């Protein structure tokens, strides 16, 4: 058993948050039911709501509440149900408060430094965790939390350079293959959390993500001192994943050479498949937003090359022409559909065999 805040996991596996609409209550609940941590992405969780175009904030908060309750019902008290909240999003704080009110077990936060997260969550039993890509970032966040809020992280997630979606590395370094590896970053983060473990009198488990694919990978990192791992791309090709089968088929058919590093309106690089949209953007084509929901703090709709909300919603529907399909570096290894239980059992069995 692994303690994270006031809750425990029987399996040290986190399912990474994937928006828009890829990881909602169905997937998160199934992972939690297996003893892991399922994670709902707050990014436009209400994209299917009838009033989403007119009032996205209300639609998203209503849907987020429903998805958390759905996940909890599926989990039946097992594991943990979390949300992934991106600092870069306009409704960041409001989404977290909605999730806390809905009974979420943990908030995992990245796409920027979640410096204010303890203040947003408040004096609740909800576990909090930053997503970091360096020991320096971990130290900066934990020092701020300790000084300003008298609190520390309940766990930390390291996302390495092989992760899917938004990446906390310089675009030039990603393209040149010069980023630190998880093997480099993990010891740094473990060293940085130690003073805060001593100060607050409890362990701060560290999970690694980004390129973790097998139970053998899991064994490698737990032997180095990680408490467990986070996977995302592998969970897309499960029956319980909330994306359309069309979305899943695109990833199942992807080859290693189809992966690209793209620039996101979030202001960060990202890893995605080389679809017609990505190809057109690389050639300099601009796709002006048809309708702006003001989903990002830094986005200028008059200048942005494309609307990431529209592109991700089209992807989750399976629209290859207009969709942006985020993926991890190992997407080419996906071979078939599985149930969440089958995938979790496979990972845990391989992990134990390689310990």
Residue ranges of model-derived segments:
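Residue-level detector of alpha-helix initiation sites
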Residues: 22, 212-213
């Amino acid at each position: 058993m692994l303690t994270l805040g006031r809750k425990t996991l029987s399996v040290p596996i986190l399912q990474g948050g994937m928006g828009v609409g890829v990881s909602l209550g169905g997937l998160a609940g199934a992972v939690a039911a297996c003893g892991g941590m399922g994670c709902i992405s707050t990014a436009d969780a209400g994209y299917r709501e009838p009033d989403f175009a007119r009032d996205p904030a209300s639609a998203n908060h209503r849907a987020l509440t429903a998805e958390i309750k759905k996940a909890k019902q599926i989990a039946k008290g097992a594991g943990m149900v979390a949300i992934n909240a991106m600092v870069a999003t306009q409704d960041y704080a409001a989404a977290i408060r909605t999730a806390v009110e809905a009974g979420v077990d943990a908030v995992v936060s990245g796409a920027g430094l979640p410096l204010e997260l303890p203040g947003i969550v408040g004096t609740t039993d909800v576990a909090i965790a930053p997503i970091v890509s360096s020991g320096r970032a971990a130290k900066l966040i934990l020092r701020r939390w300790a000084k300003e809020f008298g609190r520390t992280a309940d766990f930390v997630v390291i996302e390495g350079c092989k992760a899917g979606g938004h990446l906390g590395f310089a675009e030039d370094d990603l393209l040149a293959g010069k980023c630190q590896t998880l093997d480099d970053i993990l010891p740094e983060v473990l060293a940085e959390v130690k003073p805060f473990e001593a100060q607050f009198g409890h362990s701060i488990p560290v999970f690694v993500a980004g390129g973790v694919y097998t139970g053998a990978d899991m064994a490698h990192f737990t032997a180095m001192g990680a408490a467990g791992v986070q996977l995302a791309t592998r969970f897309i090709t499960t029956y319980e994943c909330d994306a359309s089968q069309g979305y899943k088929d695109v990833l199942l058919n992807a080859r290693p050479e189809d992966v690209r590093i793209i620039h996101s309106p979030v202001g960060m690089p990202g890893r995605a498949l080389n679809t017609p949209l990505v190809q057109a953007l690389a050639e300099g084509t601009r796709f002006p937003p048809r309708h702006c929901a003001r989903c990002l703090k830094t986005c200028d709709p008059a200048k942005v090359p494309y609307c990431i909300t529209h592109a991700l919603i089209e992807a989750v529907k399976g629209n290859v022409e207009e969709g942006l399909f985020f993926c991890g570096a190992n997407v080419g290894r996906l071979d078939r559909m599985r149930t969440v239980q089958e995938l979790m059992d496979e990972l845990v069995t391989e992990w134990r065999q390689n310990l």
